[in-house]
């Protein structure tokens, strides 16, 4: 199978073809996703909650990410694999580069970091040293204590203008992808249209170039609060492989996320 690359996603954006992505944390699910053609995966620090059982993503370490990245890469050797740099792993550009090197050696193709314009120098340092970067704006879970909980971001003119400015700054610094989480559809549309790089949404409506879901949300195995943007594809299909195919089909057709999964 031909490897999926950042260029593959750039082509999707240019051709206005929506694409699906998903989190993965182990060999078996990564292999299954790849076999069904879901070839863009993220080893997210969400593993702190879904795999380790913590209340937030904050306890996750670089070593945790590297461990799961290695497992996912074994299962999906040709996927485009993103890996989160966890909380306090990129406080300085130098620290970011050292930790990015660890997860890249483990098998990642790209690192994802949360934050806006303050990360410009970090993004430049990484990209100049051959580490591709995916930005992450909106609801950035590592900032949960600043936000006072998991809340929609970017409402109001000032907040939306700031996020657009952040997105443009990250792109100018060299970021090649952007994740937008829990923002109003109208803002997601503005940002997606303003950027040349692909934008992946989660809780950002169906106007972004791609979508991502935490696999546990996609299969309805998340305990406790279920995010508004989540959909249990397994409940409708009764089969994990069929659920993966339905998720991909609904993203590609624009059916998912629907109005009921979106914010304004």
Swiss-Prot record:
GO cellular component: cytoplasm
Alphabetical list of Pfam families matching this protein: Pantoate_transf (PF02548)
Disulphide-bonded residues: none
GO biological process: pantothenate biosynthetic process
Binding site residues for Mg(2+): 45, 84, 114
Alphabetic keyword roster: Cytoplasm, Magnesium, Metal-binding, Pantothenate biosynthesis, Transferase
Gene Ontology molecular-function annotations: 3-methyl-2-oxobutanoate hydroxymethyltransferase activity; magnesium ion binding
Subcellular location: Cytoplasm
UniProt keyword tRNA processing present: no
Cross-referenced InterPro entries: Pantoate_hydroxy_MeTrfase, Pyrv/PenolPyrv_kinase-like_dom, Pyrv_kinase-like_dom_sf
Protein function: Catalyzes the reversible reaction in which hydroxymethyl group from 5,10-methylenetetrahydrofolate is transferred onto alpha-ketoisovalerate to form ketopantoate.
Record HAMAP family: PanB
Subunit relationships: Homodecamer; pentamer of dimers.
Name this protein carries in UniProt: 3-methyl-2-oxobutanoate hydroxymethyltransferase
Organism from which the protein derives: Escherichia coli O157:H7
Underlying gene: panB
